[in-house]
Amino acid sequence: MRTRKEKDFISCFDSRTGVYYRTGILVNGKETEDDPFMASFPELLDIGIMGHCRHGQSGLCLQSGIQCYQNGLNRADANMRVEDFRRIISECRENTYQVALGGCGDPDQHEAFEEILKICRDAEIVPNFTTSGLGMTRETAAICKKYCGAVAVSW
């Protein structure tokens, strides 16, 4: 269980179960039941690790009737470098409980996917992501089971 004390409240996160809770504003150590507006640093961070989508570029999504809000048919940017991801995680590791991996393409298709998940877990941050599932393999599913908190398949 990770616990973080802010000026007026306390938040806790269990990385094994995903249970999260935050107290209301505390005055003289007593719960007021007033909601704190926000933490001083994001407890959940969205990180776009994908710069392109191989399924979108192949036309598979279009054939399936799926319109990509990330313009996956035409985008051809590089995926995030592992060094850049590692730096982001090192800068937020003391304050962030979870990350949502995303970008233009399925995060599980990133060339360093397992390493990215391991970097998160080594920093006690739980990685989560949404995928089309089009490139999911048994090996990738096993990696997700080992490292991820939640994986959503959006077809």
Language-model features: locations:
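Aromatic side chains
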Residues: 20-21, 69, 85, 113
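Canonical Radical SAM [4Fe-4S] cluster-binding loop centered on the CxxxCxxC motif
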Residues: 36-83
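Residue-level recognition of conserved structural "scaffold" positions that shape functional pockets
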Residues: 25, 31, 55, 110-112
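Short charge-dense sequence patches
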Residues: 30-37, 67-70, 120, 124-131
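Flexible, acidic/Gly-rich N-terminal and inter-domain linker regions that tether
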Residues: 1-46, 63
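Active-site donor-binding loop signature of nucleotide-sugar glycosyltransferases
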Residues: 25, 70, 155
